[in-house]
């Protein structure tokens, strides 16, 4: 970024911001040497939020994030109702947004803990938790950004990322509700016998 003029910096920033939420393309190699920790945290936040509803990208979706921000704003203002663009948002929608966000956050943290606590690296290289978390969020959001960690994982580590990609694409709430319904149905079937 240092060798770019102001217009190129602005254009590149816009490109990277949009790309972090959708495609994962980059116009410069992502490494911790070229991006500050603050920059990585910003990219991770954008990746975690992800694409808009109806898009093919993963993440929690922009509509979920907007619902959470509106609920936060209403809470801070002491308002009972959550209103977005003159429309009342139901408590059910807010609870769903909270469920998606918390479930997704816990899932990504579980992925990162599995990668950091198990010996999943083929080479005995040391990676920071920030690098591991970046890779897990990128997989969950199906963005495709990589800082060099993925190629150094063994098959178990790569499997964790693959599962993360499926969960991120399908949605944590959909998978948890399907699992819950299957468990609940089998419990009811056993009680009927």
Feature-to-residue mapping (PLM):
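Membrane-proximal intracellular helices of multi-pass ion channels
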Residues: 1-193
